């Protein structure tokens, strides 16, 4: 894991429109601007460490060289410059470069490289015999404390140390030194690659304090942000958060990062107004966790002020923060009546660790974070081809997570839609499988625009398993959700890639850009459409939806969408397909097409499975299988 938890809200010293520089400069040293020095096995990994550091903009790495003092080999000097550059000097074996913060491609802490003849130093806390370096790395990945390892091969000179696997950790998550040592290999834990088999506990426990060692503390607006900070701190295994109602004023909004020798809390104490939870570092699912887009009303974030500018709204203030060179978070003060043409004051701020230095309530401000990290690409957040405004037919690559599910019995036909949520997983509706006796008769086609493209020789994914929610009875009763595990993995391309699942912390997000897609009927008595159809539809409150369906119970596990006058909606054949909503430039799978009365009828909105209420179920099933 990369050191420093501040990755959650790191500072960018380059403008959003600044150039992304990926080139490494050989035999070049950046002079000055030193922040700190760490040890990394390669310049490439040094660049990743710089990217995840809250203040690092540039770096200089020293490679192994006869001309350099061996004590300087593998040093990674992290640097900062408010001018975005530093003087360059020639130096043999020096490799310099820039942080990836200003780049739009995927940034990941995952490092699967194995380093031959390198001993990465740290605290050796576990020694055991392993058959191979791969087995040693797997042990490290499945050990809650392990950051990296060193393995002595069968050719190691000392017979008694051959095949020994040393698991190691440090305070920063990076080695304290790296030295040359023949016949050993070293590498990092693959927890950041979502490959750990450790338990993943996503629940946040109210009225609970974990009474264990505090390794650090920061200020956070809610328990969800506290949990994300814990997840990206190399030593944090669990946390306790004191809410704004906590009795002791000086501890309100305090996020305590904790650890224990066993890896679990030793004692749980019942305390009102406290919440506790666990690091998600070991979870085997790639839900984006770096971005926190919520607004905090009647809340002021304190920190170093970068600038004070006029803004019409807190949304505009957040945009100013996102576009500012160094802004991490902001507080917006609404305008007084008839003052400054209705514009309020937008305070752009930063701190040394990326979190507010203090959080105050009751002063009328509205606070939030930069959205810069929301625009970082990930498997499910990669920029998708722009929507085509107007019309109903989609274009190729417009909805790359949409799949068409076919049955081959008695003849092959489109059965339902579905969404790619992982490289072996499709999320769809449970009611699609009424009468389906075996997954062997199912075929999943991805990257398809027209049903007519599907021929006998068109490639497809077989279905290994159908997982239906165990509380499902019928669509109108809820729990209309199912997972398909594919027989083979999906290789992500521009035309087939996953959509992000919503975060439990975003339950209160108001989505305004939502689309339903599918090959279903356009009216009640119709046929399956050849070309993938799309319709932009507004969400409807559950209270309003309940008024339209008095004969049914609209629960919080359902979400409704549609126009009061009708005209646009999902229909037969769209079942199981996505209700996709864009928020902060990221598409989320907000709903699964489930049921409704008729097709696009007046005052009869479509009813969808509310995906955010099933995130834990999805993760439990996809990790367990």
From Swiss-Prot:
Outcome (variant: residue 403 to M): In FA11D; dominant-negative mutation that results in severely decreased protein secretion
Effect annotated for changing residue 56 to R: In FA11D; secretion of the mutant protein is impaired
Consequence the record notes for mutating residue 302 to A: Reduces dimerization. Abolishes dimerization
Glycosylation site list: 90, 126, 163, 450, 491
Tissues showing expression: Isoform 2 is produced by platelets and megakaryocytes but absent from other blood cells.
Any GO molecular function: identical protein binding
Mutagenesis / variant outcome for changing residue 511 to H: In FA11D; transfected cells contain reduced amount of mutant protein and display decreased secretion
Residue span(s) of domain Apple: 20-103, 110-193, 200-283, 291-374
Active site (catalytic residues): 431, 480, 575
UniProt catalytic activity: Selective cleavage of Arg-|-Ala and Arg-|-Val bonds in factor IX to form factor IXa
Record note on what altering residue 43 to T does: In FA11D; dominant-negative mutation that results in severely decreased protein secretion
Subcellular location: Secreted
Paired cysteines (S-S): 20-103, 46-76, 50-56, 110-193, 136-165, 140-146, 200-283, 226-255, 230-236, 291-374, 317-346, 321-327, 380-500, 416-432, 514-581, 545-560, 571-599
SUPFAM superfamilies, A to Z: Trypsin-like serine proteases
Effect noted on mutating residue 347 to A: Reduces dimerization
Subunit structure: Homodimer; disulfide-linked. Can form non-covalently bonded homodimers. After activation the heavy and light chains are also linked by a disulfide bond. Interacts (activated) with F9 (inactive and activated) in calcium-dependent manner. Forms a heterodimer with SERPINA5. Interacts with Anopheles gambiae D7L2. Interacts (activated) with guianensin, an anticoagulant protein from Simulium guianense saliva.
Chain's role: Factor XI triggers the middle phase of the intrinsic pathway of blood coagulation by activating factor IX.
Disease: Factor XI deficiency: A hemorrhagic disease characterized by reduced levels and activity of factor XI resulting in moderate bleeding symptoms, usually occurring after trauma or surgery. Patients usually do not present spontaneous bleeding but women can present with menorrhagia. Hemorrhages are usually moderate.
Name the UniProt record assigns to this protein: Coagulation factor XI
Underlying gene: F11
